[in-house]
Swiss-Prot record:
<feature type="binding site">
    <location>
        <position position="18"/>
    </location>
    <ligand>
        <name>a divalent metal cation</name>
    </ligand>
</feature>
<feature type="binding site">
    <location>
        <position position="115"/>
    </location>
    <ligand>
        <name>a divalent metal cation</name>
    </ligand>
</feature>
<dbReference type="InterPro" id="IPR001352">
    <property type="entry name" value="RNase_HII/HIII"/>
</dbReference>
<keyword id="KW-0963">Cytoplasm</keyword>
<dbReference type="GO" id="GO:0030145">
    <property type="term" value="F:manganese ion binding"/>
</dbReference>
<keyword id="KW-0464">Manganese</keyword>
<dbReference type="GO" id="GO:0006298">
    <property type="term" value="P:mismatch repair"/>
</dbReference>
<dbReference type="GO" id="GO:0005737">
    <property type="term" value="C:cytoplasm"/>
</dbReference>
<dbReference type="InterPro" id="IPR024567">
    <property type="entry name" value="RNase_HII/HIII_dom"/>
</dbReference>
<dbReference type="GO" id="GO:0004523">
    <property type="term" value="F:RNA-DNA hybrid ribonuclease activity"/>
</dbReference>
<comment type="function">
    <text>Endonuclease that specifically degrades the RNA of RNA-DNA hybrids.</text>
</comment>
<feature type="binding site">
    <location>
        <position position="19"/>
    </location>
    <ligand>
        <name>a divalent metal cation</name>
    </ligand>
</feature>
<keyword id="KW-0479">Metal-binding</keyword>
<protein>
    <recommendedName>
        <fullName>Ribonuclease HII</fullName>
        <ecNumber>3.1.26.4</ecNumber>
    </recommendedName>
</protein>
<dbReference type="GO" id="GO:0032299">
    <property type="term" value="C:ribonuclease H2 complex"/>
</dbReference>
<dbReference type="Pfam" id="PF01351">
    <property type="entry name" value="RNase_HII"/>
</dbReference>
<dbReference type="GO" id="GO:0003723">
    <property type="term" value="F:RNA binding"/>
</dbReference>
């Protein structure tokens, strides 16, 4: 289970950073940066935190709500849009979202613990932590908040663009999503730089195929 050992060892004001949404075919990539003040945060809440992938959707939602309301927890959220993903690639867009999340924290942190094995350019010193969401409470908290935020955003998009199942698959390339992409065509919220979307766009240019890429959605 994650704890605050890494944060305490580093000293100072430390944020855990994690992202969600690198793999989906649609929607933004989202990052969260979280600072936990162990002296003020609810210990019962901290005891329930874990890697977001190990938690049910309902529990993630409850924990994210509690984290955002806890006076001992600070949260910064950052996104990179589909247009940015297609322009600079998903890795660089992920790094951009992480930097934006950290920039939301004030005052700035002394160190960022970033989940993964690569350290992006950041507005502060950083340390990459492999499987950090299972080691660091602040990274685990960031993974939960980022996941819940992005899932909610995709559910909202699903209301405007029904048929792709985004409220269930969050834009990932499930069988349902791929079938809808073939049947309905790509939308402005699809990542044109990803192969399945690129192939769908090529098919949509053929006579008799539907294309919705000319539509705009707010």
């Amino acid at each position: 289970m994650p704890d605050l050992s890494l944060e305490r060892a580093c000293g100072g004001r430390v944020a855990g950073v994690d992202e969600v949404g690198r793999g989906p075919l649609a929607g933004p990539v989202v990052a969260a940066a979280v600072v936990i003040d162990a002296g003020r945060a609810d210990p019962a809440l901290l005891a329930r935190l874990d890697d977001s992938k190990k938690l049910s959707a309902a529990l993630r939602q409850r924990l994210a709500t509690a984290l955002l309301a806890d006076p001992g927890v600070e949260v910064g959220l950052g996104e990179a849009s589909v247009a940015e993903i297609d322009r600079i690639n998903i890795l660089q867009a992920t790094f951009l979202a992480m930097g934006r999340a950290l920039a939301k924290l004030a005052p700035p942190v002394d160190l960022a613990l970033v989940d993964g094995n690569r350290l992006p350019p950041l507005p502060c010193p950083g340390q990459a932590v492999v499987r950090g969401d299972g080691l660091s409470l602040s990274i685990a908290a960031a993974s939960i908040v980022a996941k819940v935020h992005r899932d909610a955003a995709m559910a909202t998009l699903a209301q405007a663009l029904p048929g792709y199942g985004w409220e269930r698959n969050a834009g990932y390339g499930t069988a349902e999503h791929l079938a809808a992409l073939d049947r309905l065509g790509a939308t402005p919220h699809h990542r044109a730089s990803f192969a399945p979307v690129r192939e769908a766009l090529a098919r949509s240019a053929l006579p008799g195929h539907k294309c919705v890429t000319a539509l705009t959605f707010s």
